[in-house]
Structures are given as structure tokens and as C-alpha cells.
């Protein structure tokens, strides 16, 4: 998914938190920053004024304005022009400093958003850097039901009619929590972290065939829903094999693997759907098994080691 943010959106999202006010350049409120640009050019998303390697949001504190004031008039104007030509998403003056008239005029002329804030520079830098990094992070929507099971994020996937929603309903009745049904959105907020959330349209809702759309919060209470969760495991429901295969299902280690999501390989466990199988119990067991494996405990490997040792002892 391509992600972007406009100057107007950033202003509205951070206006209350940072006390932002427009000073000039309001005609540039539709100026846009796309995630693709941050990858190809690799600028800093937010930082103190830098005319050589410009940040996408330039912060001007007292030192930056003092530096501008120390320049000769011609050099000062050339520097301001260069700043505007770098096409920043916005300029922000800290501590509600008085905006220099030449800077205001250049912002209006070039359509560069210029804001004032009562916050100190480091506060602006921390908030804006985090917010922009989060907003522009790579994201993808996956089909399935995303739940919190035993405190870890588990995505239940499978073909239509495989019983994902019914399984989710059973897990809810067993005390686990729903994050999103049908279309959870995952954002890579760190090199090894996928954060899953629910689209606003689908919040608190679970669709079950024969019952329609259920409001999980109303049926099971506030504790049955979760705003977000990191994705740690995918449980895939599949139809049983109708024809024998050379290997069949792996009896010792189970059908385990990984699924590539954005830049991460997420652990995957496949569960065959068959009459009489308690999928809720199996999913809970799969989650517990994953937790054990993350701690370095692998029951299958332990059994194989025991078996090998036994054979070695009995071999003359």
C-alpha cells in the first residue's frame, strides 16, 4: 500500500499536541510527502534547519534564526530561497518566536507551509519524527481474523468457508481477544515488528455465516477487543488432502513454515480442517507451541534426540 501525508493532515493531526499555528504559506497545505520519496532520497523526516541536506520538516529554533540573522543580506536571501526550493513539507518555528518578514514572504510566495509552536525544538523533533515514521511506514492488508491468543498476535487465515470466523467466535468464548476481522492492516513499525490494527469501518465487528455481523464489544464486553497487537504467528486453516502424497502431513514437527509479509518472515502453522477436530484447542496448542519454540524449547527435536540416543545405546 502506498502511504502519504499532506501538510494539512500533519497540521491537523499534531495541532493540539504541539500547539501548531499557521504563520504563512497556507496555499501549500496540499503539499504531499509520500513514503516512496523517503526511500529513494532517504532524507530525514524531521530535523533542525539544514540547507545542504534538507529535512522534510525543517525545525527552526533560536540558534537557527540567529544563524540566519548573522548572514549578509544577499547570502541570507539566497539561503532562504534554497530552503524553499528544497520543497519541504513544512517549516516550524519553536517557542512561538517572531517570524522574520523575509521568511514569511518567501513561504507565502513559494507556498511552503510555515508554522509556529510553543514547544522546544527537541519536543517537536521527537513527536514529528515518530509520527511521520509511523504514518509512512510500509503497510499491507491481509485477509483473515487477527486475534490476541495467550498475549501474542495470531492471524488466522484460510480459504472462504474454512471456518475462520467460527473459530474466532469459539476463541472469544474461551477468553481470547479480537483485533480485526476480515481485513486487518499490518504496519512495519520496526525492522522486526509488524503492528496489526483494525480499519475504522470494521472495529469491534465479526461476521459469522448464518449469524451475520456481530458486535463483539457488546456481546463479550470491552475486554474482548484489542486496539492493536504485534503479529507473531499465522495459523492457516486448510482442507485435508484428498489424495495421498509421498510425505503426507509431517507427524513429528507438524506442518510449520513461514510466510513473507512485507520484509519479515512470520512463523506459519497449518492446521487441516476435518470433522470432529476441535480447532479452538488446536489453535491454542499451536500458539503455546510457538511460545515454547521462541524460548528454545522444541518437543519434536527433543523426541528425535531421545530416539537417537536410545538407538545408539542399543546398537552393539
Curated annotation (Swiss-Prot):
It catalyses: [HPr protein]-L-serine + ATP = [HPr protein]-O-phospho-L-serine + ADP + H(+); [HPr protein]-O-phospho-L-serine + phosphate + H(+) = [HPr protein]-L-serine + diphosphate. Coiled coil: none annotated. It is an enzyme of class 2 (transferase). Gene3D superfamilies: HprK N-terminal domain-like, P-loop containing nucleotide triphosphate hydrolases. Homohexamer. This is HPr kinase/phosphorylase. GO terms for molecular function: ATP binding; magnesium ion binding; phosphorelay sensor kinase activity; protein serine/threonine kinase activity; protein serine/threonine/tyrosine kinase activity. Its cofactor is Mg(2+). The Walker A ATP-binding motif also binds Pi and PPi. The lineage of its organism: Bacteria, Pseudomonadati, Pseudomonadota, Gammaproteobacteria, Lysobacterales. HAMAP family: HPr_kinase. Residues 272-277 are annotated as: Important for the catalytic mechanism of dephosphorylation. The keyword ATP-binding applies. The active site is at residues 143, 164, 182, 251. It holds the Pfam family Hpr_kinase_N. ATP binds at residues 158-165. Both phosphorylation and phosphorolysis are carried out by the same active site and suggest a common mechanism for both reactions. GO terms for biological process: regulation of carbohydrate metabolic process. Mg(2+) binds at residues 165, 207. Keywords: ATP-binding, Kinase, Magnesium, Metal-binding, Multifunctional enzyme, Nucleotide-binding, Serine/threonine-protein kinase, Transferase. The keyword Metal-binding applies. It comes from the Bacteria. It comes from Stenotrophomonas maltophilia (strain K279a). Residues 206-215 are annotated as: Important for the catalytic mechanism of both phosphorylation and dephosphorylation. Catalyzes the ATP- as well as the pyrophosphate-dependent phosphorylation of a specific serine residue in HPr, a phosphocarrier protein of the phosphoenolpyruvate-dependent sugar phosphotransferase system (PTS). HprK/P also catalyzes the pyrophosphate-producing, inorganic phosphate-dependent dephosphorylation (phosphorolysis) of seryl-phosphorylated HPr (P-Ser-HPr). NCBIfam families: hpr-ser. Its EC number is 2.7.11.-, 2.7.4.-.
